[in-house]
Swiss-Prot record:
It comes from the Bacteria. It comes from Aeromonas hydrophila subsp. hydrophila (strain ATCC 7966 / DSM 30187 / BCRC 13018 / CCUG 14551 / JCM 1027 / KCTC 2358 / NCIMB 9240 / NCTC 8049). The gene is luxS. Binds 1 Fe cation per subunit. Its EC number is 4.4.1.21. This is S-ribosylhomocysteine lyase.
Amino acid sequence: MPLLDSFTVDHTRMAAPAVRVAKTMQTPNKDTITVFDLRFCVPNQEILSERGIHTLEHLFAGFMRDHLNGNGVEIIDISPMGCRTGFYMSLIGAPDEARVGAAWQAAMSDVLTVQEQGKIPELNEYQCGTYSMHSLEEAHAIARHVLERGIGVNRNDELALPEEKLKSL
């Protein structure tokens, strides 16, 4: 099985919250697609709560689009990581980490403005696969955590696992 890009970086050295360019590629039409690792939690030390990450998934996707789309950028998708330490964001364009971090920070502030569970987008059995598994309170705690700690940058060249280490794992 091929080694995926996300497993070539040392998770023991990742900072959080932090933005990382996980991958950049070109489409046949020469559009740039960039995948960002938006790391909310320090891997293997912290984890996003199940209900909190689910609620955040519903809120974060819209708020990030509000703050990042435009000027050559269009978000394709924002999805939670299976390890529950962050989200992957795929987009058309190549914004720098500072622009993504500023949008992320603004989106977390927006999350805190949602004051009622009933205001969570798509919170119904028709549009959500587990619509009863939400917590606005936990999503607020995650947003506050990000805002209090600030958003840094993780760089692939600083986190790359050496080839010999990859072979031994």
